[in-house]
Swiss-Prot record:
Zinc finger (CHC2-type): 39-63
EC number(s) on file: 2.7.7.101
Top-level class of the enzyme under EC nomenclature: transferase
Essential cofactor(s): Zn(2+); Mg(2+)
Protein name: DNA primase
Keywords carried by this UniProt record: DNA replication, DNA-binding, DNA-directed RNA polymerase, Magnesium, Metal-binding, Nucleotidyltransferase, Primosome, Transcription, Transferase, Zinc, Zinc-finger
Coiled coil stretches, renumbered: none
Residues at which Mg(2+) 2 binds: D319, D321
Function: RNA polymerase that catalyzes the synthesis of short RNA molecules used as primers for DNA polymerase during DNA replication.
C-alpha cells in the first residue's frame, strides 16, 4: 500500500522550476554555473531572469518578478494559487495517487496569512473611521470629499488615527477573528531578521507607518486584500499618498484598483489615474479601474483580457494635466498593439481630474464629460496636428501607428474606414496620394489580391480618385467574404455532438441564423443541425459512428473537409470533456457567436 504524503513542502519540491519555465516556451541558457532566460513578464532584450535549480526559484533582475514554479504560472496565466498548483502538477507529470487529495484544496499558507492580516487591518481601520469624531474622519470624506456613506462602505475606507503609535500593535494583538493571533512582529517593517513583517510599524522608532490618514484597501485581481494606500488629511504628512511596502504578494504596479469589484460582462471600462477618480465615476454609474500611476504593463493587460470577455471599448480618462495627457499617447500605443478598441476622453473643463470636476460641478457634469470622447483616429489626428506637422507626415504617422496592430493588418474593412476618416478629418483633397500611401503600408494585404481586385494599373499605381469608390467597394466585398469564412468554428459543431445541451442552448444564441447567413462553401450548416438533432434522438451517448450513420453519402462527400475538422476535435475533446464543464464552454461559444454576428453586421453596413 502506498503511503500518501501530507506534506505540501514535499509536493512543492517536486515542481521543478526549469520544467515549468520550459513548458511556456522560454529557452533557458547556461552561462557558467548560471541559468538565464529572457523574462516573459516584460520586454526583455537581454536575458535578465536568473533560475536556480537547487532552490527551485526564478528571479528577474529587471522587473523583479520572482518565486517558485507556482508563482511563475500565477503570473503568466493570471491564476489563483490553487489553480496554478494543479496546473504545475500536470506540467511536471506528478502522480496524484502518491499525495493526499486535501493538498490540492489548500492555498499557499504564507499568502493566506498575508491576506488574513490585511483583512484584519481593513476591519480595524474601518472601525476607527466610524468611531472618530474629529474633522479628519468621516466628516472629511462626507463634507469635504462629498462621498456618500454607501460608497465609503463599498470601498471599505478606513482611518489611521493620529496616535496609532500607541494603539495599532496592541489592538491587532487582541483582534479575535484570526488564528493564530497576530504577532507584533508581523506588523513591523520587513528586514532580513524579520521577513514576515508587513511594514505597518517601525520597531526601532516606535512609530506607526500610517497616521492621520484615510486608509484605502487595495486588492489583487481575485479580490484578496494585499495592501493599502493612505491619503493624508492634514498638512503634517509631507506626502499626499503613502502606500504599503512592496511585498512578494503586493506589487502595486501590477494591480488595478477596483478591478475585482467590476462586472465580468461589462462592455466598456474607464481607465483613470487615482482612487478618488474611481469613486467619482462609480458614483456616476461608470465602471472604472485606477492605474495608481501612469503606466500599464503586460500583467495588467493580460488580466483585463482574461477577465472581461465581453469588453468592447477601453476609455482612457487620465487626469487633465500635463503628466496625464502626456501619458495618454504611450498608453494608446500599448493598448492598440494589444488589439483593444480605445476611446479617449476629450476634456472640456479646466479641472485637474474627475474628483475636482465632481467637487466643483457635481455628478451631472461628470456624466457629460465622460461621454465627450474621441475615437482612436480622431485623437491621433488632433495629437499630431498640435505638433504642427505637415498633412502628409501626419497621414504617414497615423497609418504607421495603426498598422503595428496585426489585427488591423488583417481587417480589410478597417482599411476603408481608415481612408474615409482620414479624408474627412484632414480635409484631404488628394485621395489618389492618400490611397497610394495606404497601399504602401499595406503591402502584405495588397499581395493577397490580384490587380483586377485592387484596380491597379500596369504602372503599379492606384487608379485615379474617381475609381476609388469602385476599389473600396471591391475591398469591402472581399473583406465580407473572408470574414464569413473566418466565422467557421468547427469546435462549436463538435461540442454539439458531444453534449446535446449545446445544440439546445446555442439555438437560443441564433446558431441557425448565424451559420445559415454565412453560407459556407462545401458545408451545409442547416442540414448539419438537422442531422445532429436526429443523431441525438437515436443516441444516448456521444459517438462519432452514431453521427455518421444518420448522414447520407452525398452529404459526406460534399462536406468531407469540414466534417474531418469536426471529427478531429470531437475525438480529441470527447476523452477529457466532463458534463460539469458545460457552462464554461457554453459561455465561450455564446460570446464567440455574439462577436461574430456583430462583425458581420458591421461589414454589411459598410457594403
Amino acid at each position: 500500500m502506498v503511503n500518501k504524503s501530507n506534506s505540501l513542502d514535499e509536493l512543492l519540491k517536486q515542481i521543478k522550476i526549469t520544467e515549468i519555465i520550459q513548458h511556456y516556451g522560454v529557452k533557458i541558457q547556461t552561462k557558467g554555473n548560471s541559468l538565464l532566460a529572457l523574462c516573459p513578464f516584460h520586454d526583455d532584450k537581454n536575458p535578465s531572469m536568473s533560475i536556480s535549480s537547487s532552490k527551485n526559484i526564478f528571479k528577474c533582475w529587471a522587473c523583479n518578478a520572482a518565486g517558485n514554479g507556482i508563482a511563475f504560472i500565477q503570473k503568466h496565466d493570471q491564476l489563483d494559487w490553487k489553480t496554478a498548483l494543479k496546473k504545475a502538477i500536470e506540467i511536471c507529470g506528478i502522480k496524484l495517487e502518491n499525495w493526499n487529495s486535501n493538498l490540492l484544496t489548500k492555498v499557499d499558507p504564507k499568502q493566506k496569512r498575508y491576506w488574513e492580516i490585511n483583512n484584519a487591518l481593513i476591519t480595524y481601520y474601518q472601525t476607527r473611521l466610524k468611531r472618530e469624531t474629529n474633522p479628519n474622519g468621516m466628516n472629511y470624506l462626507v463634507e469635504k470629499r462629498k462621498l456618500n456613506k454607501t460608497l465609503i462602505e463599498q470601498f471599505q475606507l478606513g482611518l489611521a488615527f493620529h496616535n496609532e503609535d500607541k494603539y495599532l500593535c496592541e489592538s491587532m494583538e487582541r483582534y479575535p477573528f484570526i488564528n493564530p493571533k497576530i504577532k507584533p512582529s508581523e506588523l513591523y517593517l520587513f528586514s532580513k531578521t524579520n521577513q514576515q513583517g508587513l511594514g505597518f510599524f517601525d520597531f526601532n522608532t516606535k512609530k506607526a507607518t500610517f497616521q492621520n490618514q484615510i486608509m484605502i484597501p487595495i486588492h489583487d485581481f481575485n479580490g484578496n486584500p494585499v495592501g493599502f494606500s493612505a491619503r493624508s488629511v492634514d498638512n503634517i504628512n509631507k506626502l499626499k499618498y503613502k502606500n504599503s511596502a512592496d511585498h512578494e504578494f503586493f506589487k502595486k504596479g501590477e494591480l488595478l484598483f477596483n478591478f475585482h469589484r467590476l462586472n465580468k460582462n461589462l462592455n466598456q471600462l474607464f481607465i483613470v489615474e487615482g482612487y478618488f477618480d474611481v469613486f467619482t465615476l462609480t458614483n456616476s454609474k461608470f465602471e472604472a479601474v485606477a492605474l495608481m500611476g501612469l503606466a500599464l504593463n503586460d500583467v495588467q493587460i493580460k488580466a483585463i483580457k482574461a477577465h472581461f470577455k465581453e469588453l468592447q471599448t477601453l476609455v482612457l480618462a487620465l487626469d487633465n494635466d500635463a503628466s496625464g495627457q502626456n501619458a495618454v499617447f504611450s498608453l494608446i500605443e500599448k493598448l492598440n498593439n494589444n488589439n483593444f478598441i480605445v476611446e479617449i476622453v476629450q476634456w472640456e473643463h479646466n479641472y485637474k481630474d474627475w474628483d475636482e470636476l465632481y467637487l466643483n460641478k457635481g455628478s451631472e457634469q461628470v456624466i457629460l464629460q465622460a461621454n465627450k470622447r474621441q475615437n482612436l483616429i480622431e485623437y491621433l489626428v488632433s495629437f499630431f496636428k498640435k505638433q504642427q506637422l505637415d498633412q502628409r507626415v501626419i497621414t504617414n504617422k497615423i497609418i504607421a501607428f495603426l498598422t503595428k496592430n496585426q489585427t488591423i493588418l488583417n481587417d480589410h474593412s478597417f482599411l476603408i474606414f481608415l481612408i474615409k476618416n482620414l479624408v474627412k478629418l484632414l480635409e484631404y483633397s488628394d485621395e489618389k496620394t492618400l490611397y497610394e500611401t495606404v497601399l504602401k503600408h499595406k503591402e502584405k494585404l495588397v499581395s493577397k489580391f490580384d490587380n483586377n481586385r485592387f484596380y491597379i494599373n500596369t504602372s503599379g499605381h492606384a487608379q485615379p480618385p474617381q475609381e476609388l469608390q469602385k476599389t473600396t467597394a471591391a475591398l469591402v466585398q472581399t473583406a465580407f467574404e473572408e470574414a464569413v469564412n473566418e466565422l467557421w468554428k468547427p469546435e462549436i459543431f463538435a461540442f454539439a455532438l458531444i453534449d446535446k445541451r449545446f445544440l439546445v442552448e446555442l439555438k437560443q444564441s441564433h446558431l441557425d441564423e448565424v451559420f445559415k447567413e454565412c453560407n459556407f462553401n462545401l458545408f451545409d450548416v442547416e442540414l448539419f443541425i438537422e442531422k445532429a438533432r436526429i443523431y441525438w434522438s437515436e443516441n444516448q451517448t456521444a459517438n462519432w459512428v452514431g453521427f455518421e450513420s444518420v448522414l447520407d453519402q452525398n452529404y459526406l462527400l460534399n462536406n468531407k473537409a469540414r466534417l474531418l475538422e469536426i471529427k478531429d476535435i470531437f475525438l480529441d475533446e470527447l476523452t477529457c470533456y466532463q458534463a460539469n464543464d458545460f457552462q464554461n464552454y457554453l459561455k465561450t461559444f455564446q460570446t464567440l457567436l455574439k462577436q461574430q454576428k456583430q462583425r458581420l453586421k458591421n461589414l454589411k453596413l459598410t457594403l
